[in-house]
């Protein structure tokens, strides 16, 4: 199998397929057919994967870290640790040390920091907190704790989807949470469904309805009243972008 095909398979549907592709790529690395950048002492221990919101599976995230010359890499998904074991195994296969953890959003309304913008740019009295360096023996225990958070967020997500559909109803646009949004996530495998999944599903529907380019820009800036910068308009005017749906989301 060609190297590029193996890289694509790092985002395959099943964990077994993804790790199998990593093993095949490691063989190319060992033979010198794939040149690995020298490690320069940099690390990224806050990497999101498809178990929250990302275009990269845990295995693909590790691959990208190796090919970026990182010395270590860590998985941090919102409200989820079920991608951690795959991430650890991919690190062993591809030869890079890994760390694991998770990120949660916390409410500070009843504290002296109420009303302040802490580290959440979109909301006051709210802060993101990360748990780094989770012991490998505690993954199941952490997941049991995070299940409650995922269940609460699912209720919130459904309400957000309902409200968004109310806004979009005059334009004959509607999303079904279970049919259109959840399948974009790894919820079936213990991943989280985030607000970005909702917006990504909407981006797909907008592209289907208006296409890529001027008509979509006009709808966003006209009927929806979204102020678009010149840079954003330029990005959305490029129908050939490989990440067009992400540009719409953002």
Residue ranges and their predicted role:
Residues 3-56, 68, 148-250:
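Domain-core and long-helix interface of multi-subunit machines
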Residues 37-189, 193:
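A metal-dependent hydrolase metal-coordination microenvironment
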């Amino acid at each position: 199998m060609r190297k590029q095909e193996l890289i694509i398979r790092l985002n395959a549907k099943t964990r077994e397929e993804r790790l199998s592709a990593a093993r095949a790529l490691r063989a190319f690395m060992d033979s010198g057919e794939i040149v690995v950048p020298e490690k320069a002492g940099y690390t990224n221990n806050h990497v999101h994967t498809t178990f929250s919101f990302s275009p990269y599976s845990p295995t693909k995230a590790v691959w990208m870290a190796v090919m970026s010359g990182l010395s270590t890499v860590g998985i941090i998904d919102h409200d989820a640790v079920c991608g951690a074991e795959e991430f650890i195994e991919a690190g062993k296969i591809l030869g890079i040390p890994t760390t694991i953890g998770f990120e949660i959003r916390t409410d500070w309304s009843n504290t002296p920091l109420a009303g302040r913008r802490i580290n959440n740019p979109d909301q006051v009295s709210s802060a993101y907190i990360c748990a780094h360096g989770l012991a490998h023996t505690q993954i199941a225990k952490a997941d049991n704790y995070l299940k409650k958070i995922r269940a609460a967020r699912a209720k919130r997500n459904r309400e957000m989807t309902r409200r968004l559909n109310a806004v979009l109803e005059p334009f004959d646009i509607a999303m079904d949470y279970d049919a259109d949004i959840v399948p974009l996530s790894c919820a079936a495998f213990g991943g989280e469904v985030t607000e970005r999944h909702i917006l990504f599903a909407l981006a797909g529907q907008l592209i289907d309805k208006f296409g890529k380019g001027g008509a979509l820009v006009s709808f966003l800036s006209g009927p929806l009243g979204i102020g678009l910068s010149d840079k954003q308009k330029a990005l959305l005017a490029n129908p050939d972008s490989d990440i067009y749906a992400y540009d719409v989301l953002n």
